[in-house]
Regions:
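Intrinsically disordered, low-complexity regions
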Residues: 3, 26, 144-145, 173
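N-terminal core-binding DNA-recognition domain of tyrosine recombinases/integrases
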Residues: 31-46, 56-150
Length: 174
């Protein structure tokens, strides 16, 4: 048995596509369908590759935890964020002193977005029962009492915006 991996596939026209291969050497069908959907809807090969690697991390996590992708709860995604932040390959390791996260907040946010979109695709195709997007997103009213008002504040002040509850705060660029 090997590792879960991304396999690059070269098509007849030299275009690159990607497949997620499980430990037994077989393609992971739901991910294959999703990556094909991304291709059919015109997403670039780089986007497909990035999504493939994000899904590889997620399936590695699922395998480590012994979970089935069809029965994921919000609690599992919260644990997945912690797993992504861990500087160790295993979630069974507890550090004695604080260490830097293995991935940046931006990378983790991208991965969570990929997973949310993947589950939205599965839900719309009736492959999973739970609408994960409904659980991940919440409405937030942005018309607070701050002094700063955006140019279109008067248009949007009573409309809620939708935010992902798992999104990490990213440090500002210097």
């Amino acid at each position: 048995m090997g590792k879960i991996r991304i396999q690059e596939v070269i098509l007849e026209d030299n275009a690159k596509r990607y497949m997620l291969i499980d430990r037994n050497g077989f393609p992971v069908l739901p991910v294959m369908k999703y990556l094909k959907y991304l291709d059919q809807t015109g997403k670039s090969p780089n986007t497909q590759k990035t999504y493939g690697y994000s899904l590889k991390r997620f399936y590695t996590y699922l395998e480590e935890k012994g979970k089935d992708y069809k029965f994921i709860r919000l609690e599992d995604l919260i644990d997945f964020v912690g797993w992504l932040r861990s500087p160790y390959q295993s979630s069974n390791v507890t550090p004695l002193q604080q260490e830097r996260a293995k991935r940046t907040e931006k990378t983790i946010n991208l991965t969570i977005t990929v997973i949310a979109n993947f589950y939205d695709y599965l839900y719309r195709n009736e492959e999973v029962q739970n609408d994960m997007m409904e659980k991940l997103m919440k409405q937030v009213f942005t018309g607070g009492h701050s002094r700063y008002k955006s140019f279109l504040h008067h248009v949007n002040k009573n409309k809620p915006s939708i935010r992902n509850i798992l999104k990490l705060k990213e440090p500002r660029k210097k």
